[in-house]
Swiss-Prot record:
This is Vacuolar ATPase assembly integral membrane protein VMA21. Belongs to the VMA21 family. Disulfide bonds: none annotated. It holds the Pfam family VMA21.
Amino acid sequence: MPVDVAPGVIKKLMFFTAAMVICPLLTFFSIKQFTTNTIVSGGLAALAANLVLIGYIVVAFMEDTTDVKAESKKD
């Protein structure tokens, strides 16, 4: 059973998946260069992961759903 998924949705998902992996790792090791305290590095990496997640939620809520609304009115 094929499902029609818009290419834009897949691109957003792939972008935020990569960002969820890359941003915290980059933050952790970048901050670790400036300080030896791994708790600070880990905390900021967790903050980076949360910011990516919040960004994904905001983008998901702002996504255009006019096609879905038009089809539900037809039925």
